[in-house]
């Protein structure tokens, strides 16, 4: 250290003590959590872990039948009854995920997708009804005096509950269908350069892509109604007055968006929108002896991590065998999260596991590639750790995520329905052997990590902020209080247009009057002149 920068140790210790003593620590608060099951919960769980470490209490509300939400030390789990069993739930979920790999006629696939969407929507709504009509539980929640509700607005039940209990809400979200996030924040959303969800458009669109971008919401209007309208009806019933979907999504004090401008395209944001992309990369842990042994045995070739997310762990036999054949043709050891029937052609370099520490494996320097369904959870772990991807998107925003990463040169996208064993083999060899993929993902990783505050700390800060101040009304734009024609200034435009037209009309009338006067006078002069000459 330079002589001029040296500080005596006692003085340094005293300074640090003073700094800590004036730090505005939040008092212990109570957080009510209404999560969405699946990978969104896995990210939210990290925020709850940190809130617990800072002295806050969290209560997680969940149906007693679910996929991943189980009791843990850093929160209290409160489960409520639903009219189906775990076996029924698992069977239906497996049926949905198996359908991702079935080749069907376009209309049949669309029809099946609509049926799935409708069934999922009905199930979520039924869960919400069971929760809100559980009078004993609602009384208990009301008496507990929670400081904030943390919820994922993909399931609007959390918004209904927060509004019903009059507790400030923080939304923890990645995407909501039907642009409800833009409507809930009153954030500008021009279709000219902000691609709509599920379109796979970029922010630089051709004319036809802009046409598609504008018309796509109309095509999804049925899905939007199916997805959101039941919650508005339920809220209207509870409040005994008309409540719209926009009223529900506008209730949030702060929106914690699990994205950033490394993965997402530049777009406008509002003051109460906070970007926490990569929050799930926090709290990395050392690998167990089992996985360390797999990596050590891989030698100089390293490993490939293969997981299709929290929902998909079984694949139809024919497709599984094609995948296994491709995996056997690369020199790397493949760790494949898979619980289905073991493919008969599984090679010696491929190890099937029921669970794997995905983020910790991706963070190991011997990991060469990541085979993923391109969910935002996995994509961010790939970005955080700088691992190129082979992406096999299955549903939802995964197609958009894959398109963005492929455009940025961070991976290769395969159509899971059409890909062959050779396609997967070539894609793996490309991302492993072509240095450009590694360089591109490392560049994205460097950009993502170059930030003043870690995403987890930022998320926890804003939850504590809302608890301390009982909301954030100063961040709420006045646009929420305008009618649609006021928002677009149509009344002002109409008024100014009327003024211009009125002035133009008066000017025209004056000119016409003056013209007639002048013309009449000139005519009389000519007539008088003619009479004199005669």
Curated annotation (Swiss-Prot):
Main location: endoplasmic reticulum
Entry's transmembrane regions: 492-508
Membrane topology: Single-pass membrane protein
Entry's Gene Ontology molecular function annotations: enzyme binding; enzyme inhibitor activity; glucuronosyltransferase activity; protein heterodimerization activity; protein homodimerization activity
GO BP terms: bilirubin conjugation; heme catabolic process; negative regulation of fatty acid metabolic process; vitamin D3 metabolic process
Induction: Induced by phenobarbital.
Positions glycosylated per UniProt: 119, 142, 296, 348
Pfam families: UDPGT
SUPFAM superfamilies given in the database record: UDP-Glycosyltransferase/glycogen phosphorylase
Catalytic activity as recorded in UniProt: glucuronate acceptor + UDP-alpha-D-glucuronate = acceptor beta-D-glucuronoside + UDP + H(+); calcidiol + UDP-alpha-D-glucuronate = calcidiol 25-O-(beta-D-glucuronide) + UDP + H(+); calcidiol + UDP-alpha-D-glucuronate = calcidiol 3-O-(beta-D-glucuronide) + UDP + H(+); calcitriol + UDP-alpha-D-glucuronate = calcitriol 25-O-(beta-D-glucuronide) + UDP + H(+)
A single Gene Ontology CC term: endoplasmic reticulum membrane
Location in the cell: Endoplasmic reticulum membrane
InterPro entries: UDP-glycosyltransferase, UDP_glucos_trans, UDP_glycos_trans_CS
CDD domains: GT1_Gtf-like
Family assignment from sequence similarity: Belongs to the UDP-glycosyltransferase family.
Further details from the record: UGT1A4 isoform is part of the UGT1A complex locus which displays alternative use of promoters, first exons and terminal exons. The locus is defined by 13 first exons, which are alternatively spliced to 3 other common exons and 2 alternative terminal exons 5. From the 27 possible mRNA isoforms, 9 produce functionally active polypeptides (UGT1A1, 1A3, 1A4, 1A5, 1A6, 1A7, 1A8, 1A9 and 1A10) called isoforms 1 (i1). Use of an alternative exon 5 (5b) as terminal exon is leading to 9 additional alternatively spliced products termed isoforms i2 and which lack transferase activity.
Subunit composition and interactions: Homodimer. Homooligomer. Interacts with UGT1A1, UGT1A3, UGT1A6, UGT1A7, UGT1A8, UGT1A9 and UGT1A10 to form heterodimers. Isoform 1 interacts with isoform 2/i2 suggesting that oligomerization is involved in negative regulation of transferase activity by isoform 2. Isoform 1 also interacts with respective i2 isoforms of UGT1A1, UGT1A3, UGT1A6, UGT1A7, UGT1A8, UGT1A9 and UGT1A10.
Protein name: UDP-glucuronosyltransferase 1A4
Organism for this UniProt entry: Homo sapiens (Human)
